[in-house]
Amino acid sequence: MLEPFPPPVHTPAMRLTVHGKHFHLDGSPHFLRTVTYGPFPPDARHSPDKDFPRVRRAGFDSVRLYALPDRTLLDLAAENDLIVIATHAWGYGCDFLREKPSLLEDARRTLTNWLTLHKNHPGLGAVLVGNEIPSDMARWMTPWKVNRALDTLIRDAQRIAPGLPCAYANFPTTEYLEPPSADFTAFNIYLEEGESLANYLPRLHHLAGDRPVFLTEFGLDTARNSEEAQATLLPEALRLSREAG
């Protein structure tokens, strides 16, 4: 378990922003401690009204969702002093530029409509416009064209919700997908040794330039690693991330 947070303080005006290489919360530098929540199989039993208080008590201050949440879920997060990192899930796993261009247009429309409704919600912290486009598809569609499409989504979001941090959740196989308009660099990485993480973090900061780095997924293969192994790596990962900036 992470060291406990102070007692929750409900702040209706709470807002996550980007200042240079760092995130700020309500104007002060803030180190996000995020846990992924979902996606869940159709028959899974999960209850956010019970899970979110547990997430907060475990020492996390934010949850990454793999969808654009409705008002009820955003309200529940805010009530538990959790920041929501929303992910726009659309058909980016196929050729959305030549074979199915309507997917991208639908994605733009869905994102702008959702942001119009929820951009000022105190529980919303940031938006990811996609997650891990398969490397073979990215190469097939041409990397710079994929980057341009992702950048279009980000600029749409920034136009509708100025100041709301937006990015794309990348992974090491497609380092070249780094939309220029992104407010921060987001990466999903699974490195099972602290030394490997320590060696890769400087690479991420190099890719990010003057933007913050946010590890949007991190952990171990739970089928092969015990809870003890996970509990050992997590504090080390937090320490290394802080040291890397």
Please annotate each region the language model reported.
Residues 10, 17-18, 24-185:
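Active-site mouth of glycoside hydrolases
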Residues 139, 145-244:
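Extracellular glycoside hydrolase catalytic/binding regions
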Residues 19-22, 195-197:
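A short, acidic/glycine-rich surface segment
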